Regions:
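An acidic, low-aromatic, low-complexity terminal/linker signal
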Residues: 1-115
Length: 115
């Protein structure tokens, strides 16, 4: 019997991507973000999530994709990274799916620092 993994899926510029559901803290819509004037382009700002300060990152920018159309409001997937949390801006959230671990592609080496 092959090993199974459960993923929270989301769409970015027409591509479906998944992250292990155990890493997902919650999904937010229309949560206010405070901009940071001198932050890197991908950093959209900070949000206060029940007293926890969370960095908001636009995955389109990180992955070199075109900017999100203005009429498309991003959905925020808050993921746990060690003791911290990061809000990943995505186009839309899909389903939670269970797949054979072998059916999933590994994270590209260019993104390994985000692992």
């Amino acid at each position: 019997m092959s090993e199974r993994t459960t993923l929270c899926t989301f769409r970015l510029d027409g591509h479906w991507i998944g992250i292990e559901v155990s890493s997902v803290q919650e999904v937010l819509r229309h949560h206010p973000v405070t901009s940071l004037r001198w932050a890197q382009e991908a950093v959209q700002g900070l949000l206060n999530l029940r007293g926890q300060i969370v960095t908001a990152v636009d995955l389109r920018c990180v992955l070199g994709m075109p900017p999100r159309p203005e009429q498309l409001t991003p959905t925020q997937v808050v993921v746990r990274v060690g003791a911290a949390a990061v809000s990943l801006w995505v186009d839309e959230v899909g389903d939670v799916v269970e797949l054979d671990a072998g059916a999933c592609e590994r994270v590209p080496g260019t993104l390994s620092r985000m692992n």
